[in-house]
């Protein structure tokens, strides 16, 4: 064989070898891939889910890898297509994911998720006073208002639901619409800076930022706490038992429920703003699905 042909064959074989090893990463078939809605800043999420991956790997004796996503819809899409095996969803995104992925299983929620709340915050220069009832939300008409992510349960869906109960539409805010900051942390920032006069976000994130000194209470304050509703939960893809062995999904649930407030687990729970994870079921989220359909977020 001429030298040129031998070179071409060698190059083709080398290229095939590269493609065959990179088309499917070696960790993809054997690693549990976990993800979460990006509801806070990436630095905190990377730390939280990095620690959780380590905790689960030790409990399950399988490699666990955290794979971040760019936005809420991306978490639902990655779960549907198999890019993520286990995802920490909000109430709405969890319902969306399960409707798009038949056989998906709700595994757990935090001890705070069965009775969750959102808070409405206001810039102190807005002159807005504390609100004592849902009907009091009418006082926000004409204000610059920001939700968090468009697909957030605590930062958009439920706040809009309560606004609707008060008879206030997003078109009645300043500029004829509400803004979307993208995350709970960002909502605090845009209201605190005065870019928006009012915003709605996850109460747990607000309390965490307050505790860590990241809120200037001379510039922003809580004016209303919503009634309770069910929110975040862990959802697993179908087929994990086939991939990791019989009973794996149950073991995964037990691993989450078994995280203790000591050692690495203590930090994980603190970052989640919880004392423990508790069992959860899909039936708890029927009200969220109903509100999602009413507001056009589920079709």
Predicted features and spans:
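An extracytoplasmic/periplasmic, membrane-proximal ligand-sensing/linker region
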Residues: 29-32, 40-51, 235-236, 240-299
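Extracytoplasmic small-molecule ligand-binding "clamshell" domains
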Residues: 29-93
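A bilobed periplasmic-binding-protein/Venus flytrap-type ligand-binding module shared by bacterial periplasmic
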Residues: 38, 118-130, 230-244
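Ligand-binding cleft/hinge of the Venus flytrap
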Residues: 51-60, 153-180, 210-216, 290, ...
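Short helix-initiation/N-cap motifs at beta->coil->alpha
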Residues: 66-77, 90-92, 170-189, 228-230
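A ligand-binding cleft/hinge motif common to bilobed small-molecule-binding domains
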Residues: 88-101, 164-165, 190-193, 197-217
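Short beta-strand->loop
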Residues: 103-113, 174-177, 210-228
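A conserved helix-loop-strand patch within extracytoplasmic ligand-binding domains
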Residues: 110-166, 172
């Amino acid at each position: 064989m001429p030298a040129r042909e031998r070179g071409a064959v060698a190059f083709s074989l080398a290229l095939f070898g590269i493609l065959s090893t990179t088309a499917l990463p070696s960790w993809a078939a054997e690693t549990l891939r976990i993800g979460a809605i990006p509801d806070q800043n990436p630095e905190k999420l990377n730390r939280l889910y990095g620690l959780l991956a380590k905790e689960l790997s030790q409990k399950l004796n399988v490699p666990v890898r955290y794979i971040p996503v760019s936005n809420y819809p991306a978490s639902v899409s990655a779960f549907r297509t198999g890019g993520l095996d286990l995802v920490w969803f909000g109430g709405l995104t969890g319902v969306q994911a399960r409707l798009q992925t038949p056989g998906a299983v709700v595994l757990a929620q935090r001890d705070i998720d069965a009775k969750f709340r959102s808070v409405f915050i206001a810039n102190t220069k807005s002159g807005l006073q504390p609100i004592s009832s849902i009907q009091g939300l009418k006082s926000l008409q004409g204000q610059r208002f920001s939700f968090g992510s468009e697909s957030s349960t605590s930062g958009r869906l439920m706040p809009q639901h309560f606004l609707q109960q008060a008879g206030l539409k997003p078109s009645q805010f300043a500029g004829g619409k509400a803004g979307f900051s993208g995350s709970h942390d960002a909502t605090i920032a845009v209201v605190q800076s005065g870019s928006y006069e009012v915003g709605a976000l996850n109460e747990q994130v607000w309390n965490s930022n307050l505790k860590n000194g990241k809120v200037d209470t001379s510039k922003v304050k809580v004016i209303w706490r919503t009634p309770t509703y069910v929110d975040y939960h862990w959802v697993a893809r179908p087929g994990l038992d086939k991939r990791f062995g019989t009973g794996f999904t149950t073991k995964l649930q037990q691993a989450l429920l078994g995280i203790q407030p000591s050692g690495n687990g203590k930090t994980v729970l603190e970052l989640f703003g919880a004392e423990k994870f508790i069992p959860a079921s899909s039936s708890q989220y029927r009200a969220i699905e109903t509100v999602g359909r009413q507001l056009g977020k589920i079709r």
